[in-house]
Amino acid sequence: MLPDAVSCVVILKIRGQEPRLCLSREYRYPAGHFLLSVPAGLLDPEDATEENPVFHAAARELREETGITLEESDSIRLVNPLVFSTPGMTDESNALVQIILNREEMPKVSQEGAVGTECFDGFLLLTQEEAQKILKDGVDDQGFFYPLYTWAALMCFATGMWK
């Protein structure tokens, strides 16, 4: 069974620098404001024809939402193949994927690849300490609550589970 969507925990490991968790501010229409988000999106029909549909969708979403293309030095792994978002209300499911970008220098990030109604307002490149603070506070640096998949990414990064 394939999930409906993929959500990505994206960690930047730049030589000589502290690792960073890459999150964005994405406008979420039901919430009525920008929320701290991970690169994520639906699996498209063409993803299903690929050898690994989930990884194909994750690479596409990374490119669309951050402008970053996976390179040979990067790693991608499945954290969870199928997580139900709110099984009491909907059958929506996501695969949770971890992407580690192993780079010599910081890649250029861009939200120019947004499609449809996607609307972004910048990135946060969090240190482990900053991720822990957001988790402890229960809200982002602007006082907004964040989605469950953002919480999962923060937990994965803040606890060192990604290593």
Feature roles, as predicted:
Residues V54-G113:
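A contiguous pocket-lining binding segment that forms or flanks enzyme active sites
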Residues C22, A57-L62, L148-M155:
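Extended, compositionally biased low-complexity polar/Lys-Gly-rich tracts
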Residues L12-G16, Y27, I100-E105, Q128-E129:
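Short loop segments at secondary-structure junctions
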Residues M1-L12, G16-R60, P81, V115-T117:
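Conserved Nudix-box catalytic region and its N-terminal flanking loop in Nudix hydrolases
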Residues F34, P39-G41, V79, M89-T90, ...:
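Nudix hydrolase/Nudix homology domain
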Residues P45-A48, T86, L135:
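A generic structural signal for short coil/turn motifs at secondary-structure boundaries
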